[in-house]
Amino acid sequence: MRFHGGRTRAYGDRMELRIASLTERPEMRERVLGMANSWPEFVTEDLVGNAHYARISAELPEYVLFAEDERGEIVAHAHSVPFALHAEDRGELPARGWDEVLVWAFSDLRRGVRPDTVSAISVVVDPRAQGHGLSARMLSAMRDNARAHGFSEVVAPVRPSAKHLEPHTPIEEYAHRVRPDGLPHDPWLRVHVRAGAAVHAVAPASMTVSGSLAQWRRWTGLPFDTRGDVEVPGALVPVRCEPERGCAVYVEPNVWMRHAL
């Protein structure tokens, strides 16, 4: 589950929000998809995400929520997908996390398989509105929406929001690190736990971005001319660069969290 937003505060301490789904207001789709975000460019180059993300709002609009402030500006949105976790040959949350749950969800939709679980996909907050608890409010609205559609569990392949500050820390260690009060060290994991979730497992290969060295140079502004691990701003783990093969690969780990409703 991706969480994105900057740190600039351009609003007062209290934000009055109106939250709706795209089923209720389909005319808002382009504005929702066009809302500002702070995703690192390379993150948007995941081929699975590129093939499926925009389809959520087109084919599953009841699972896309957005928030408007008192001026009618869209300040946040949340995407989720229903899927059949307990279908044959599944049953366990996938190691390929975010990518695979998107594939499962649209495969189920295409084949008419009845879903039994909702997976969070993203919560995005406009950089100007960050710092007012919107991520927690959108997560709560996503939980309520899943419950209203008859589901008893939301799962989330969570992208820890501060992991990029420690790209060499093993994800297993990071995911289970807690503060003295027992809450997770990571801010985004902490929001989920406060909402009622529990850490379930690591998704070691939740998202994969591969590209030529020229592409990685364009995406990051870094030289990508030396074999080995390259630290990229915003990346949770180093990117593996192999100049002799002319390519580099980023395999992002996430943390599976489970919300009982």
Where are these regions (language model features)?
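ATP phosphate-binding glycine-rich loop and adjacent ATP-lid/helix-beta elements
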Residues: 189
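Conserved acetyl-CoA-binding loop of GNAT-fold acetyltransferases
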Residues: 193-201
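Short amphipathic alpha-helix that is part of the acyltransferase structural core
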Residues: 11-97
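Short hydrophobic/aromatic beta-strand element in the GNAT-like acyltransferase core
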Residues: 62-66, 77, 117, 122, ...
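N-terminal amphipathic/basic-hydrophobic helices that include classical n-h-c signal peptides
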Residues: 1-14
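Conserved acyl-donor/pantetheine-binding loop and adjacent beta-alpha core of acyl/acetyltransferases
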Residues: 79-122, 160-185, 203-247
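Short beta-strand-to-coil "C-cap" segments at the C-terminal boundary of structured domains/repeats
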Residues: 258-261
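Conserved acetyl-CoA-binding loop-helix of GNAT-fold acetyltransferases
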Residues: 125, 131-148, 153-156
